[in-house]
Amino acid sequence: MTRSSIQPKTLSPARISVARLAAAASLALALLAAAAPLAAQTPERRPPGAQPPAAGPGEIRGTVVDGQGSTPVGSASIAVRSRADSSLVAGAIAAADGSFRIQGLRPGAYYLRVSMLGYTPQTSATLTVTPAAPAVNAGPIRLARGAVALAGITATGERQAVAIAPDRNTYAARNVAPAATNASEVLEAVPSVQVDADGVVSLRGNENVVVQINGRPSPIRGAQLAAYLKQLPANTLERVEVVPNPSARQDPEGMAGIINIVLKQNVDLGLSGGVTLAASTADRYTASGNLGYQRGPATVFLSYGFTSDDRSTTGINDRTRLALGAPLSFTEQSISGSSGNGGHNFNGSIDYRLSERNVLSSGLLVNLRGSTDASTSLYSELDATRILLDRYQRIRDSQSDNAMVDYTVGFKRTLQPQRHELSAEGRVNRQGDDDRTGLWRQPVGGTSQLDAEIDRTRATTWQLTGQVDYTRGLGAHTKLETGYKGYARWHDRDYTVLADPLGTGSFAPSDLSNTLALDEQVNAVYGVLSGGAGRWELQGGLRAEYAGRQFSLASTGERFPHSYASLFPSGLVSYKLGEQDQLKLSYSRRIRRPGTQELNPFPVFFDLQNVFLGNPELNPEYTDAIELGFQHSARMGSVQLSPFYRRTSDVIRIIINTADSVAGREVTSVSFQNLDTGDSWGADLNGSLRMGQAFSGLAGFNVFKTVTSGGGGESSLSSNAVTWSARVNGTWNVTPRTALTAAYFYRAPMKIERGRFDAFANANVSVRQKLNGDKASLTLRLSDPFNQQRFRIQAGDDNVIQLTERASTSRAVHVTFQYNFGQAPRVRQPRQQDPPPQSGSPFGG
């Protein structure tokens, strides 16, 4: 802190009791105990090249090779499925030379499903085992590299940390952040992704990024999304996909692109599961369990997670009022307090294969969150010579309860994997929020009067989403993707303020109370054509969209309707320079729609002198993004260089007015305004390194320049800034059972309109010890060992300058225990597990 007199102070902390942790741990362990009898009946995962116990005289053998270089692909997963009902019969993992041999098969018709991280899954033709010919040679099975699969990559293993494709980078969660306890900590370790002290996620320095869960946009945003990611257990994440320039098939929201968090959905064999328990010296606790089961046509996955996170916070808000450049008066605000966050997260999914071609899926997500925030701010009013005029305290005590339920049902018909498919999905989401805040002002030996204020916000949001997608191959190397997506959202919020300005104990409704409603509808159709010829891969698409919103204020009767039509073209060209090198060029148009709080013009006070004001006249902002990329992949790792350029119109920017007046108070207001244009360009340099089994690492460097123009003579709102960030993450396997991991991230200072953000840094170091083979592990992690995590911003003009700084408890020791049982999961996504190629109508039975 700038002033050493600030001391941490804890007020009404939301501390977790031993009983709360024991209850959550008991629930996770109960899941384990219930599944233990079944797990005992589930065969263990076999080592590479091994086969299941003999059940018949048949066998299938073959080799897995790279589709372009014919080099062996070791460690690929081979699943043997029945031709009759697609049920899983047996499985194996290819040896280092790509060979496999699966024995003990009864006479019958089968097919193979072969998958490997960084390659497109491959389905074989029908293989028939008969008493007369029990041995079947599947021959070489060629896998196409993910780098030429424009539809994306399916991660099916954990042996590589990163897979590179023209449109996205895919990071295996367990490899990138082996010591992480929640999704937010996993994202901190992903190159090009930043997570600040408040949990806000950004991509290449841009916070306007869409976070998806299993390919679907998260229905929550802002602080609620940050809280949710901190409650999502890390062991439920399979991989993270970073898509900086999505195609027209994807939703166009997110100016910086898309971060897709793929959760574990189901497993390939029998039953598997796990339990995670974690605790830290900083009052942070986690308990979670997951269970997956596959039998015949049905696949079920369940997970539960509990978190509790209590932190102390310190900070300052210093205001200097100026007259002709000379100090006129000072206000010094010292903040100390505590915050607590906790919640429960449940995720369940069921996939049922109706036939060889048709799959019905259903998913349910329930998230319950609660938080507390208690703080005391000490204000000192000083004159120009820094003589004390007045001193008082502002006490803040708030509680928040949030609940979200998300249900999805989908159908998919596959005639040829990724070549001829039809899918439909419906989704309903409901969120409820109840926030309560009390504010008190008390004199400290001065002349100030005592006052009090009680705020309560109750909000309900419903969203209905429908989507239909159709894929059809047009020849051997060309594919057409087309579809429709629409959603409707209804948001109602009641904001009640009761004020006691004289401190008499009599509260009355304030003029700051208001009720608002936001109705929003979006309908879109898209078409994407992709194909290849020789070393070239091409993709072009167009998305047409019509959107409308109506923002209304019940207290004033005002309505702010706004409707607009948009076109979102996209394109991608990639060229393979050789077996290991590739060039790409991509383009897409993106949109950012203003959120509810950004539109709400009624003031919301953080404290006595800081207020939040929305702008109901905001327009959406559009960004045209171009990216050039070079990728080099080799046995020991990969290197990726990606220069990019973004041009944004109607830029939505946070405007900090240090000399505003609201409800008769002199305040610093935070609002939003559309600026004229914004340009940003820069480059990403990311690399991965793998030195056998001893060492693996990731490193990234990002530099970008941002220029905004206020337009209309608002030169004071313009900015011109250059900033950069760097990240390194390495894992050293000291022994086959012990691994040491260290990570460091640094973001340089950055200019904004009327101000400047200071630098931000974060470090983590951990050691992980395997127990009981690979079934269990114990991890010890030290977070922020140098105590560098803090937020600092300076903003102002010729009249007022304000310095704000915040820091919370971040340096801590974490201990995590994980136990897995049953089959080691080879995770697959329902949209990628396809039956063997068939012919026929996509609408047939």
Where are the language model's segments positioned?
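Short, acidic Ser/Thr/Gly-rich low-complexity loop/linker segments typical of extracellular
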Residues: 83-99
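N-terminal periplasmic accessory domains that precede
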Residues: 140-141, 183-186, 225-228, 254-275
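Transmembrane beta-barrel wall of Gram-negative outer-membrane proteins
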Residues: 279-314, 327-375, 399-407, 413, ...
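Outer membrane beta-barrel strand-and-loop segments of large Gram-negative receptors
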Residues: 334, 453-455, 463-467, 507-516, ...
